[in-house]
């Protein structure tokens, strides 16, 4: 009975650690149409473990992603790869004259983490000509 109980406990513990390992993917797909793991880049970041020691690839399907994105300092070792730069666009429209936010807060995408790369996509600030604006703000 003691051996059976130990076996059941070991099986349950092993099963829960396997579930935790399966929770963190090394490839994530973002697609506006819902065909991927996430619909937005912001949602995808929630699916990436903090301070990873392995590389994660985020495949971004073509589409226009209108969102203000912050990649926090705990997000490291991530490659964002778009389908192509002409049709995979991350955009927002803040500018310096909105609520006196100043130029440095107008970014579309802010990178605070290290070892973050972007390939085959466009990052733009689509603000009207009402004030200065930043597309990419990098601190990492």
Residue ranges of each PLM-predicted region?
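Short active-site-proximal "capping" loops at secondary-structure junctions
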Residues: 63-67, 85-87
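Short, T/G/N/S-enriched strand-turn elements that build extracellular solenoid repeat scaffolds
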Residues: 39-50, 66-74, 80
């Amino acid at each position: 009975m003691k051996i059976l109980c130990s076996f059941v406990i070991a099986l349950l513990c092993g099963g829960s650690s396997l579930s935790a390992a399966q929770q963190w993917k090394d490839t994530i797909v973002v697609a506006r149409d819902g065909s991927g793991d996430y619909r937005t880049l912001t949602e995808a970041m929630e699916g990436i473990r903090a301070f990873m020691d392995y590389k994660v690839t985020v495949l971004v399907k073509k589409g226009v992603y209108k969102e203000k994105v912050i990649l926090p300092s705990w997000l490291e070792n991530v490659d964002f790869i778009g389908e192509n730069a002409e049709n995979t666009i991350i955009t927002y429209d803040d500018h310096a004259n909105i609520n006196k936010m100043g130029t440095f807060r107008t970014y579309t995408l802010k990178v605070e983490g290290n070892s973050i790369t972007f390939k085959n996509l466009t990052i733009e600030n689509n603000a009207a000509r009402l004030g200065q604006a930043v597309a990419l703000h990098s601190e990492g």
